[in-house]
């Protein structure tokens, strides 16, 4: 088994440190819709990073990296929707 890639590690940290705390503030009506979609997108991003890291075939690796990029774009769209609905406010404070 290959060592976890930087993308995989950073996505896991992003999910734990940033996404989960944001999702706690969602209204109950959105817990099983937009909230769930955001979590699923993060999981798919991690999965794509793991798959790309464990493959040796360059073409298949690029396919999984393209999928990771698409999931990242979807995640940005979903977070934008949440921000527009005022479920979250994206204020970044450095640790």
Q: What do these predicted regions represent?
A:
Residues 14-15, 19-22, 41, 45, ...:
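Amphipathic alpha-helices that form helix-helix packing interfaces
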Residues 17-31, 51-59:
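Helix-loop segments that flank and shape redox-cofactor active sites
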Residues 61-86:
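Mid-chain, well-packed structural core segment of small domains
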Residues 1-9, 60:
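Short Lys/Arg-rich basic patches
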Residues 25-29, 81-88:
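Surface-exposed helix-capping loop/turn segments at secondary-structure junctions
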Residues 92-95:
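Conserved small/polar residues in nucleotide/adenosyl-binding loops
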Residues 46-54, 79-83:
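Membrane-helix exit/interface motif
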């Amino acid at each position: 088994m290959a060592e976890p890639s930087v993308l995989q590690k950073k996505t896991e940290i992003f999910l734990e440190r940033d996404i989960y705390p944001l999702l706690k503030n969602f209204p109950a009506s959105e817990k099983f819709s937009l909230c769930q979609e955001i979590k699923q997108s993060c999981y798919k991003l991690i999965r794509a990073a793991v798959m790309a890291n464990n493959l040796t075939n360059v073409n298949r690796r690029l396919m999984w990296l393209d999928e990771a990029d698409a999931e990242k774009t979807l995640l940005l769209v979903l977070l934008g929707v949440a921000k527009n609905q005022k479920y979250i406010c994206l204020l970044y404070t450095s640790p």
